[in-house]
Structures are given as C-alpha cells and as structure tokens.
Swiss-Prot record:
Catalytic activity: L-methionyl-[protein] + [thioredoxin]-disulfide + H2O = L-methionyl-(S)-S-oxide-[protein] + [thioredoxin]-dithiol; [thioredoxin]-disulfide + L-methionine + H2O = L-methionine (S)-S-oxide + [thioredoxin]-dithiol
Identification of the protein by name: Peptide methionine sulfoxide reductase MsrA
EC code(s) of this entry: 1.8.4.11
Lineage top rank: taxon: Bacteria
Keyword Transcription regulation included in the entry's annotation: no
Job of this protein: Has an important function as a repair enzyme for proteins that have been inactivated by oxidation. Catalyzes the reversible oxidation-reduction of methionine sulfoxide in proteins to methionine.
SUPFAM superfamilies for this protein: Peptide methionine sulfoxide reductase
GO molecular function: L-methionine:thioredoxin-disulfide S-oxidoreductase activity; peptide-methionine (S)-S-oxide reductase activity
Annotated catalytic residues: 21
Keyword field: Oxidoreductase
NCBIfam families: msrA
Gene3D superfamilies per UniProt: Peptide methionine sulphoxide reductase MsrA (3.30.1060.10)
Amino acid sequence: MNEITDKNLPTLERATLGGGCFWCLEAVYQQIQGVKSVVSGYAGGARPNPSYESVCTGATGHAEIVDIEFDPKVVSFRDLLEIFFVIHNPTTLNYQGNDHGTQYRSVIYTHSDEQAKIANEVVQELEDSKIYADPVVTQIESAPTIYPAEDYHQNYFQQHPHQGYCAAVVAPKLAKFRAKFKSLIAPQYA
C-alpha cells in the first residue's frame, strides 16, 4: 500500500478570468488538461453574494468570471492567458459581441505577485505584437472575493450545447480554442 503524502499531491493554483459571458470561458477551460475545476461566478463588485439578476443590471460592479483551479506542472498560468486572449476580444471596453455592460469586461484577477507579473508581460507582448489595431483594455487586479454563480450557470454549455446562445457564441469560441491549442486539450475531450 502506498503512503499518501503531500509530496504525492499536486500543488494547485487558481486563475480568475473575465472576458464576456462566463459560459464561453467555462466551456473552453473545462477542456484543458491540467485544469481540475472551473466555476462560473462573479467578482469585482461591492455587493456581497450577488445574484445573476443583480449583476446583469450593471449596478453591482461585478464581472462575470470563471475561477479555475489548475495544476501548474501540467498547464501554466501563461498558457491559460494565451488561450484567454485568443477566445475573447481584449480591446472592447465592457462588452464582447452582443453582450454589453461592465459585467462583461475583460479582466484578469491575480492570486499572487507572480501571476500579476506574468499577466502584465503577456498584455505587453500583445501590445508590442500589434495583433490588435486597438489597445488592449484588459484590467489586471488582485483577486477580490469571488462568488460562485447560481447552480444553473455551472457546466452550462455541457448541459445545453444546442441552446441558441451556446450554438451561436460558445461553440465557435470552443472550436477556435480546439483548433489553435490542440496540444492542451485534455484526453477525454480530444
């Protein structure tokens, strides 16, 4: 019988990202090898325990986010950010496609000084590359309190792949990810 010690357990990290509707981000990050969990939620606002309805008004200040738990020995924070900047438009202030409001802002909530450094480096590399005609408006902030979204928002695309928004918006982002990052797709999704 093998002894279970802390040395045998992976040291997991968190990444918290907002870039439009959380259903899109959740669907992508769930398919990445090394990602252990993805929770759709809200962060960055003043009201504790916000509801979807209150966040949708734009009055709470929260962003729709995904809180990702990952094994950095399998997938790096930089990898997660490179995916992030491919699957959403970081140059549009407070909207993605037809989703408008501060709750859809592009934001990276960091959980360490190292994550903040990497996030700033990746944004600077994007700016220097001139991939986008407009400046990157992604906010980089220390992670605030994160509130999980309601249960019906969790695993949304997996449960409703043919729902209108999922078919029109989420599926194309997922396809874009799968085409560009084949080596990062978890075996069960390959």
